[in-house]
Amino acid sequence: MHYSTSPLGEAGRTGEMQFIEMMQAGVLVSMSIDNVTAERCDCFACMHMLQTVNKHRTGGKFKLTTKKLVEMATIDGARDLGFDKVTGSLTPGKRADIILVRTRSPHMGSDGDAYDALVQLAQPSDVALVMVDGRILHRNGEFTALDYDKLLADGAQSVAALKAKAKWS
């Protein structure tokens, strides 16, 4: 059995997320983002929110490690979707799906624990590189594999067409 939690959306809508009980019962719990129009598309914030919700809900009785939170956002998500044979971990033979995160900034701290830094301190602006299947798609704040201006123009054109079709101004 699998369950994907969307912490940023669920925390504001449904009250208590009982994912700890699910994990204890053997359910594979992964992390997701439900709706990019209603919440931030920020995996770091999702991990941090899940950690915070867990601390408040369980009073710290169930320690959800930052390593486990990163696994929930990576390999557990791939397992949940049935993609774990091709992605979700850095393993020979799998696709090279990688993000590189800048750690040399004042807000990232200096204690040296990579999992703690990713979950508790990292922000989307810290992502220096995104590689999907070995192709660099984003580097230093710039998309490298798509025409961003064309994407925005196509999106605006689609919205205008939908509004016209719906007779909505």
Where in this protein do the model-derived segments appear?
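His/Asp/Glu-enriched, well-ordered alpha-helical/loop segment
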Residues: 18-106, 121-123
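Active-site microenvironment of metallo-dependent hydrolases
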Residues: 71-169
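Generic beta-structure capping elements
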Residues: 3-4, 50-52, 133
